[in-house]
Amino acid sequence: VATLDGKSAYADADFVVIAAPTNYDPVKNYFDTTHVEEVIDLVLAVNPNAVMIIKSTIPVGYTRSLYLRYARQGVKQFNLLFSPEFLRESKALYDNLYPSRIIVGYPKQMNHPDFADEDQAIASIADVDRLRQAAGTFAALLVEGAIGNGEPFTFDGPLPIADGVCPREKTKGIPVLGMGMKEAEAVKLFANTYLAL
């Protein structure tokens, strides 16, 4: 059932895909992530157990900063992934059916002093093993919805993306990669930069 009521839409959801606009603000020299954060706040209020997947274009480091922000706000559980989309202008349907790659970023410990606060926040409010599994499940759903090379695909659980590239014989020939969220954000940035050239 289609609805414009976020509360009813998110109440029983396992996954909430956030594809809100993030317009570039030339004054701030930054993406306006206000709408993404509004969705996150509503999901946390209605269904904090749901896994949220950001598909919007966001700055590098944004998702890890959200873990830090929500940990400081006292949130007990925060389930956030990032899965960039690689859609060309006027080719969105084709690019969804025949994706050049599927990437799902999940929270990983960076184990470096510069990221100690973020690592601690992630450890305190995220079940990293559950989110790694959820990333594999979401990747499998994206493969299931794609045509790829036309090979049959049977959803039988999460794809094994935790250690990098999933074997292509499991993914209709589509490269499927799991990585840290900051890495996934950087891949999206580099792809956008390349397409802008």
Describe every region a protein language model picked out.
Residues 1-197:
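Structural/interface elements that position substrates and couple domains in central-metabolism enzymes
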